[in-house]
């Protein structure tokens, strides 16, 4: 028996791709690399995505069709191609990002998102290329804190992939689930759905070249944290707490989570937020509302650096609500505090990278 291309293509035309009504030939899924050598046939099937759920069944169906309609003696070799480039492996999703910093807290209400936003701004003011991902899927705040609630990221094809283009504000690339949901609508997702949404914001976005990629993580410890450490090569974690003992107890848990053998993320240091209250009219006065130097004591106990102490000043809240982070004003008390924090984060990051 002599084989020729039409025999093979006619056989493949009997195989339909599920849900389209088209056969493999009509759907242009048979690549133009069909080769025949005696009773051996080789070619590629083209799928839209490298993770096509019907890939294995289509390969099997194509082999069966050739054996049924041509000859059971034909040796078939089928390779696969995809019209969309494959997503990089976990841990290599952002090859152009130099440092990934997770900003975390053991509990809510300690100002973690405020610290993350202002750290990103301060790093940008120091001249670094910065991205900020609002990984707090169930309580996104980045759109509000940067006054971009009405912004809607768009998709653009880059290197054969459809990627989400982050919003840019104050020289920082921003993405948040808050850009895609109604701000008044609660996000009622199971852990798997939230993790998948987060993976999309990381791996399916055009982050480009960044010196620092800041992750504003959810408070506490959750599936989201595990997703982050399994998806990204995190350079280090910054733990935010107030000086209050109940907050410090949860901060200790956060440190232990990251240093767990299964997670193994270095702790860059602690940030003490709400260290003291300073009234605008009396900038030299300090009132320790939540205790004094609690984070300093915890840092010494856990043998991690104290990266900064951020005072309570009325303008921090006002600026956050207006979408103008306090770090934009380097001459203010809080602006200077956040610049110092950013400088210390850079020092600890460089130290960690040199090890």
Where do the PLM segments sit?
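Phosphate-binding loop that captures ATP/GTP phosphates
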Residues: 123, 128-184
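Residue-level signature of catalytic and energy-coupling elements of molecular machines
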Residues: 12, 30, 97, 108, ...
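Conserved catalytic-core segment of NTP-binding enzymes
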Residues: 59-60, 211-212, 218-309, 314-318
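C-terminal boundary of histidine-terminating zinc-finger modules
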Residues: 322-332
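N-proximal, solvent-exposed amphipathic alpha-helical segments enriched in charged/polar residues
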Residues: 1-34
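Extreme N-terminal, non-catalytic leader segments
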Residues: 26-29, 36-37, 41-104, 353
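Walker A/P-loop phosphate-binding motif and the immediately C-terminal alpha-helix
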Residues: 100-136, 270
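Switch II (G3) loop of P-loop NTPases
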Residues: 153-156, 177-192, 199-227
């Amino acid at each position: 028996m002599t084989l020729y291309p039409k025999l093979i293509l006619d056989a493949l035309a009997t195989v339909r791709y599920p849900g389209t009504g088209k056969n493999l030939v009509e759907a242009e899924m048979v690549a133009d690399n069909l080769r025949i050598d005696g009773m051996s046939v080789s070619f590629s099937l083209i799928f839209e995505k490298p993770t096509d759920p019907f890939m294995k069944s289509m390969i099997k169906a194509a082999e069966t069709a050739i054996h049924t309609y041509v000859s059971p003696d034909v040796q078939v070799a089928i390779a696969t191609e995809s019209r969309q480039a494959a997503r990089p492996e976990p841990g290599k999703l952002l090859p152009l990002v130099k440092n990934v910093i997770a900003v975390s807290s053991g509990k809510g209400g300690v100002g973690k998102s405020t610290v993350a936003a202002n750290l990103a701004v301060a790093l940008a003011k120091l001249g670094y290329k910065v991205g900020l991902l609002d990984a707090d899927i169930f309580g996104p705040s980045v759109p509000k804190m940067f006054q971009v609630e009405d912004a809607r990221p768009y998709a653009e094809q880059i290197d054969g992939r459809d990627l989400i283009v982050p919003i840019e504000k104050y020289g920082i690339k921003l993405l948040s689930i808050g850009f895609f949901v109604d701000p008044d609508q609660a996000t009622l997702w199971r852990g798997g759905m939230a993790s998948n949404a987060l993976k999309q914001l990381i791996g399916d976005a055009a982050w480009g070249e960044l010196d620092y990629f800041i992750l504003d993580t959810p408070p506490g410890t959750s599936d989201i944290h595990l997703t982050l450490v399994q998806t990204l090569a995190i350079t280090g974690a910054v733990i935010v707490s107030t000086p209050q003992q109940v907050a410090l107890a949860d901060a200790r848990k956060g440190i232990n989570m990251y240093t767990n053998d299964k997670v193994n993320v270095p702790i860059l240091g602690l940030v003490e937020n709400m260290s003291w209250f300073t009234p605008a009219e009396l900038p030299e006065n300090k009132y320790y509302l939540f205790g004094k130097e609690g984070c300093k004591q915890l840092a010494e106990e856990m043998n991690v650096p104290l990266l900064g102490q951020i005072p309570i000043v009325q303008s921090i809240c006002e600026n956050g609500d207006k979408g103008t982070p306090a770090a934009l004003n380097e001459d203010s008390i809080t602006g200077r505090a956040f610049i110092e924090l950013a400088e210390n984060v850079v020092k600890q990051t460089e130290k960690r990278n040199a090890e």
